[in-house]
Amino acid sequence: MVEKVPMTRGGHAALADELKKRQSVDRPRIIEQIAEARAHGDLSENAEYHAAKEEQSHNEGRIAELEDKLARADIIDVSKLSGDTIKFGATVTLIDEDTDKKAVWQIVGEAEADAKQGRISITSPLARALIGKKKGSSVEVVAPGGAKAYEIAKVEWR
């Protein structure tokens, strides 16, 4: 059985946009670069040719990866979720119990996780510790950097 890849609507759209760009913009550009480099003659010492072929390999690998993830996507409409129990798609406001510093994270699929954008993978240590918990609970997260304790201040669905 094929393992489904959970993702939000926004995450699915972003991956689909990246796939479309790689197929319709990057692929033709790289093919043109290869043709130009090939026109320069001897391929054995043609750095432009080898660089373009390497870029083509990277691009085609990413296209295959995106096609696979999109084919296995289990799209979850977060706007239709509710409740005060944390699960996939929840946006959680945490307060560090040591520093009182506030952090906001949305729990998403691995394919769309981006810590800089406040999105963490459902398989991350933090998300695994949060799943099933409710607002007002305390949670201890054991991560590579050590153990941290947080209070769950808010659970939202957006």
Curated annotation (Swiss-Prot):
Coiled coil: 47-74
InterPro entries: GreA/GreB_C_sf, TF_GreA/GreB_CS, Tscrpt_elong_fac_GreA, Tscrpt_elong_fac_GreA/B, Tscrpt_elong_fac_GreA/B_C, Tscrpt_elong_fac_GreA/B_fam, Tscrpt_elong_fac_GreA/B_N, Tscrpt_elong_fac_GreA/B_N_sf
GO MF term set: DNA binding; RNA polymerase binding
Biological processes annotated in GO: DNA-templated transcription elongation; regulation of DNA-templated transcription elongation
NCBIfam families: greA, PRK00226.1-2, PRK00226.1-4, PRK00226.1-5
Family the UniProt entry places it in: Belongs to the GreA/GreB family.
Function description: Necessary for efficient RNA polymerase transcription elongation past template-encoded arresting sites. The arresting sites in DNA have the property of trapping a certain fraction of elongating RNA polymerases that pass through, resulting in locked ternary complexes. Cleavage of the nascent transcript by cleavage factors such as GreA or GreB allows the resumption of elongation from the new 3'terminus. GreA releases sequences of 2 to 3 nucleotides.
The protein's name: Transcription elongation factor GreA
Organism: Nitrobacter winogradskyi (strain ATCC 25391 / DSM 10237 / CIP 104748 / NCIMB 11846 / Nb-255)
